[in-house]
From Swiss-Prot:
This is Phosphoribosylaminoimidazole-succinocarboxamide synthase. It is an enzyme of class 6 (ligase). Pathway: Purine metabolism; IMP biosynthesis via de novo pathway; 5-amino-1-(5-phospho-D-ribosyl)imidazole-4-carboxamide from 5-amino-1-(5-phospho-D-ribosyl)imidazole-4-carboxylate: step 1/2. SUPFAM superfamilies: SAICAR synthase-like (SSF56104). Keywords: ATP-binding, Ligase, Nucleotide-binding, Purine biosynthesis. Belongs to the SAICAR synthetase family. PROSITE patterns: SAICAR_SYNTHETASE_1 (PS01057). GO terms for molecular function: ATP binding; phosphoribosylaminoimidazolesuccinocarboxamide synthase activity. Its EC number is 6.3.2.6.
């Protein structure tokens, strides 16, 4: 018989996830259907989103060459029935205070940095790059981990060295870029470009750098259709950027620079976001989302 969620001590709430203690060495990592944008948790939820994030992470944890925090399968008997398919039992780690971002293309905050300084996170780039320009080699562009409601801030590699030391910083950069390349190559073979992605790493009890949190999900990555990619324009995306674009477009009536929270998403945007997340999972993994555990009976 599976435990109830109430049997576990609740430790923390994030923008999307809930964290519970299983025992002295393990945590329950639960992905909800919440969606955040521009550091706000939106009033609207995206049905099945937490299951997609979990399914995608499990797929990529198995694909890439890095130790990870998983401590059991998706149907681990320690996972309560009520969160089956959207929860994982993971090892407790000493998390690094750095968001490990890898970028293969110029977009988002990287584009803003480049337009202001000609660099991204202190890395000088050639002149003449535009929205969606592909880099010659992927970049490691770290950021600070912000508290809930605060903005992550891009930092330089030297800042990372100050935070975690030179040896660990070099290991983090090499691992981030290697994992990104593996995932991006796999996605591209299935017609999807991973423009950029964000990883989190921790240190396990043996001192090993360990991949944690979520991996290559539509929340943590920018996914573009490879068949209609074109430099110099906003791309057709499978990820949370679709929601961001609606919020900053004319239909939402929301001023990003004001002090009001974003409005709820209309039903058609909710449905389209759900469809994009599921399509990303199915195209990249080659699996049917309907076969993932925890769905309606």
């Amino acid at each position: 018989m599976r435990p109830a969620l109430s049997d576990y001590q609740h430790l923390a709430s994030g923008k999307v996830r809930e964290l519970y203690r299983v025992d002295d060495r393990h945590l329950l990592f639960v992905a909800t259907d919440r969606i955040s944008a521009y550091d706000f948790i939106l009033d609207s939820e995206i049905p099945d989103k937490g299951r997609v994030l979990t399914a995608m992470s499990v797929f990529f944890f198995g694909l890439v060459d890095s130790p990870n925090h998983l401590a059991g399968p998706p149907d681990d008997e320690r996972i309560p029935e009520e969160v089956l398919g959207r929860a994982l039992v993971v090892r407790q780690l000493d998390m690094l205070p750095v968001e490990a971002v890898a970028r293969g293309y110029l977009t988002g905050s990287g584009l803003i940095d480049y337009q202001k300084t000609g660099s991204v996170c202190g890395i000088p780039l050639p002149s003449g790059l535009v929205e969606a320009s592909k880099f010659d080699e992927p970049l490691f562009t770290p950021a600070t981990k912000a508290d809930l409601g605060e903005h992550d801030v891009n930092i330089t590699y030297d800042d990372v060295v100050e935070l975690i030391g030179a040896e660990r910083a070099e290991q983090l950069r090499e691992r981030t870029l290697a994992v990104y390349q593996q995932g991006a190559d796999h996605a591209l073979s299935n017609g999807i470009i991973v423009a950029d992605t964000k990883f989190e790493f921790g240190i396990d009890a043996d001192g090993e750098l360990t991949l944690a949190d979520e991996v290559f999900t539509p929340d943590s990555s920018r996914y573009w259709r490879a068949d209609d990619y074109a430099e110099g324009q906003v791309q057709n995306s499978f990820d949370k950027q679709f929601v961001r674009n609606w919020l900053t477009g004319p239909d939402s009536g929301w001023d990003r620079n004001g002090d009001q929270a974003p409005p709820p998403l209309p039903p058609d945007i909710v449905a389209a976001t759900r469809a994009r997340y599921i399509e990303a999972y199915e195209r990249i993994s080659g699996l049917r989302f309907d076969d993932w555990i925890g769905g309606a009976a």
